[in-house]
Swiss-Prot record:
Heme b b562 binds at H83, H182. PANTHER family: CYTOCHROME B. A ubiquinone binds at H201. One of its GO terms (molecular function) is ubiquinol-cytochrome-c reductase activity. The chain crosses the membrane at residues 33-53, 77-98, 113-133, 178-198, 226-246, 288-308, 320-340, 347-367. Gene3D superfamilies: Cytochrome Bc1 Complex, Chain C. This is Cytochrome b. GO terms for biological process: mitochondrial electron transport, ubiquinol to cytochrome c. Its cofactor is heme b. Binds 2 heme b groups non-covalently. GO terms for cellular component: mitochondrial inner membrane; respiratory chain complex III. Its main location: mitochondrion. Belongs to the cytochrome b family.
Length: 379
C-alpha cells in the first residue's frame, strides 16, 4: 500500500519538499541557514502577532504601549526582546546565506537568486518600518533621515517624501501606515520564500564542489532534518543568551527616550544590519550620489551572475578568489564599524576607501582574478 504522504494532494507537496526531496550528499553546514531563516521568520510572525495585540500605532501612546508590554503584559518583555533580537538573528542568517551563495557560486541558479534579492530588499524594508514603531528618539529620527533621502530624486522627490509621510513631517499618519505595512509584509515574505523554494527545487541545490549533484543524492529526511535541527538548537542558544542576558546589546540607548522632534540625537544611525549600506551613503558628499550608492550596494547582487568569468563555479579550489572574498567580508565589517565613529578624519577617509573597495572588488577585481585563475589552471 502506498504511503499517504505520497498520494494526498497537500501532503505530497510537503513530502516532495521536505521528506523525500533528493538532496546532494555533500552539502555542508553553510546550507543550514535557509532552514534557519524559515525558523526566524516563523518566530518573528508569532512574536509580532502577540506584540500587535497590545501595541497602539498612535504618536501619543506608541512609546507607552511598548513600555506597557514590557512591564504589565505577562511575559511581554521576553516577547518584545525575542522580536527585537530575532530580527538581528534573521539578518545574521541572511547575510551568511547570501555570502554562501557568493562563495559557492549559487547565483548561477538565476531565478532562485533573483527571488532571493527581492526577499532581501523586502526584509530590509520590513525591519526599517519595525524600527520606527517603538517611537523612541532613534525611531523618529531614523525614519525622518531615511525617508528624507527620497527627496534626492529629481522632480518628484519632495512630493514623494510628503506622500510617504502623509503630511509635512514624520507624524501620526506615518506611524499608522508603517505599522500596517510592517504587519502585512512578513506574509508577503512567506509567499516569496515559498516561490524561492519552488525555484530551488526545480533545479536542485548547488554543492560545495560546484559540480553536478545528480549522480549522488540522498533523501532530505532524516539526514538533513537532523542536521538542520542541530543548527536550530545552536541559533536558539545564541538568541536566548542575547534575550536573557544582553537584551539591549544590539539596540540603541536613545530609543529609550520618547520621540522629540525638537531634539536631535548627536548620532543618528539605523540598526547594525543596515550600517554597511548607511556607511556607503554617508561616504559620498552628494545627496543623490549617496542614495544611488546606497541602492547599488544591494542591487549589485543582481548583476553578479553577469560578472561571472570563471570556468569553475565554486571558490573551493580557487585560493585567490577565496582571499578576495574574505577581504570583501572584512571590508563590510569595516563599513559597519565606521558608522559608529564621529564624522571626522580619519574616519571619513576610511569610509570612502572601504566604499570604493566594496564596489571595486565586486565589479572589477574579482572578475579579473577569476580570468587569471582560468589562465593559471589552463581552463
Amino acid at each position: 500500500m502506498t504511503n499517504i504522504r505520497k498520494i494526498h494532494p497537500l501532503m505530497k507537496i510537503m513530502n516532495n519538499s521536505f521528506i523525500d526531496l533528493p538532496t546532494p550528499s555533500n552539502i555542508s553546514s553553510w546550507w543550514n541557514f535557509g532552514s534557519l531563516l524559515g525558523a526566524c521568520l516563523a518566530l518573528q510572525i508569532v512574536t509580532g502577532l502577540f506584540l500587535a495585540m497590545h501595541y497602539t500605532a498612535d504618536t501619543t501612546t506608541a512609546f507607552s504601549s511598548v513600555t506597557h508590554i514590557c512591564r504589565d503584559v505577562n511575559y511581554g518583555w521576553i516577547i518584545r526582546y525575542l522580536h527585537a533580537n530575532g530580527a538581528s538573528m534573521f539578518f545574521l542568517c541572511l547575510f551568511i546565506h547570501v555570502g554562501r551563495g557568493l562563495y559557492y557560486g549559487s547565483f548561477t541558479l538565476s531565478e532562485t537568486w533573483n527571488i532571493g534579492i527581492t526577499l532581501l530588499l523586502t526584509v530590509m524594508a520590513t525591519a526599517f518600518m519595525g524600527y520606527v514603531l517603538p517611537w523612541g528618539q532613534m525611531s523618529f529620527w531614523g525614519a525622518t533621515v531615511i525617508t528624507n533621502l527620497l527627496s534626492a530624486i529629481p522632480y518628484i522627490g519632495s512630493n514623494l517624501v510628503e506622500w510617504i509621510w502623509g503630511g509635512f513631517s514624520v507624524d501620526k499618519a506615518t506611524l499608522t501606515r508603517f505599522f500596517a505595512f510592517h504587519f502585512i509584509l512578513p506574509f508577503i515574505i512567506t509567499a516569496l520564500a515559498a516561490i524561492h523554494l519552488l525555484f530551488l527545487h526545480e533545479t536542485g541545490s548547488n554543492n560545495p564542489l560546484g559540480i553536478s549533484s545528480n549522480p549522488d543524492k540522498i533523501p532530505f529526511h532524516p539526514y538533513y532534518v537532523t542536521k538542520d535541527l542541530l543548527g536550530a538548537v545552536l541559533l536558539t542558544l545564541l538568541l536566548m543568551t542575547l534575550v536573557l542576558f544582553f537584551p539591549d546589546l544590539l539596540g540603541d540607548p536613545d530609543n529609550y527616550t520618547p520621540a522629540n522632534p525638537l531634539n536631535t540625537p548627536p548620532h543618528i544611525k539605523p540598526e547594525w544590519y543596515f550600517l554597511f549600506a548607511y556607511a556607503i551613503l554617508r561616504s559620498i558628499p552628494n545627496k543623490l550620489g549617496g542614495v544611488l550608492a546606497l541602492i547599488s550596494s544591494i542591487l549589485i547582487l543582481a548583476i553578479i551572475p553577469l560578472l561571472q568569468t570563471t570556468k569553475r563555479q565554486s571558490m573551493m579550489f580557487r585560493p585567490l578568489s577565496q582571499c578576495l572574498f574574505w577581504i570583501l567580508v572584512a571590508d563590510l565589517c569595516t563599513l559597519t564599524w565606521i558608522v559608529g565613529q564621529p564624522v571626522e578624519n580619519p574616519f571619513i577617509s576610511i569610509g570612502q576607501t572601504a566604499s570604493i573597495l566594496y564596489f571595486s572588488l565586486i565589479l572589477i577585481i574579482m572578475p579579473t582574478v577569476s580570468l587569471v585563475e582560468n589562465k593559471m589552471l589552463k581552463w
